[in-house]
Amino acid sequence: MILAAGYATRLYPLTLDKAKPLLPVGGKAIIEWVVDNLAGVRDLETVYVVTNNKFAAHFEAWSERYQSRKRGTQFKFKIINDGSTSDDDKLGAIGDINFVVTRENLTQDNLLVIAGDNLFTESLLNFVDCARGTDATVAVYDVGDTEAIKKYGNITVDAEGIITRFEEKPRKPQGTLAAIAIYYYSPAVLSLLRTYLAAGNNPDQPGRFVQWLYTRKPVKTFQIEGKWLDIGSKETLEKADEILTKLKA
């Protein structure tokens, strides 16, 4: 499942008429970097893209273009409109995951969940292979800088790679490992989404669910190598475009 229902107001006016995952970076839409890295993942049949009423038709058009360009793609796309029309009535990322799981009856499936504005260069084959058989696995990335980590979910892991501490946007970070928005959830974990939301927890940032979950179930980690870039502003968008254009050259 690709999360693409946000409104990216910090990137206005670029995202007034185009969803953030459809913005071009390094010669292709951000979401294509995600989808291309799914190639070869075993047993992947359907990629659900959850979006909003404003951009659903844009994602439909994009998915048709993608499949006509890349004939023989192993999976099909299903675009899900969450019905929201603005930042004021959005369901939030965790709300969207629960919405799709319920609507599409995915409660008995293992689910790979990825934020649609995640820019990373490594194939997800190894991540999925590592995650199979676990209740929950989250991708982590070493940002290499104690100042940079203050913008993200900072985690500590034990010798087995299980999360022992998770702090969102820490003032005093412990290490430089960031939890990033690439998740693998089993049916046992998907059933807890409703519990989490019913308790009035934050429905928006997907990392908040992991922060709640790790105290209840073991959450495994897998470190992503290569490049991972967070697109939160026009400046980081331009920087990402520059970096990925060079990588493709």
PLM regions: where:
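Conserved N-terminal catalytic core of the sugar/cofactor nucleotidyltransferase
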Residues: 2, 10, 24, 28-113
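The conserved acidic donor/metal-binding loop of glycosyltransferases
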Residues: 116-119
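Short, hydrophobic/glycine-enriched beta-strand segments
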Residues: 1-6, 202
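Catalytic-core segments of class I nucleotidyltransferases/pyrophosphorylases
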Residues: 128-129, 162-230, 234-249
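Short alpha-helical oligomerization interface
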Residues: 16-21
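Short alpha-helix within the catalytic core of nucleotide-sugar-dependent glycosyltransferases
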Residues: 35-36, 60, 121-133, 190
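A structural signal for short hydrophobic beta-strand segments in well-ordered beta-sheet cores
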Residues: 22, 155-157, 221
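Conserved donor-nucleotide/metal-binding helix-loop-beta segment in metal-dependent transferases, i.e.
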Residues: 122-150
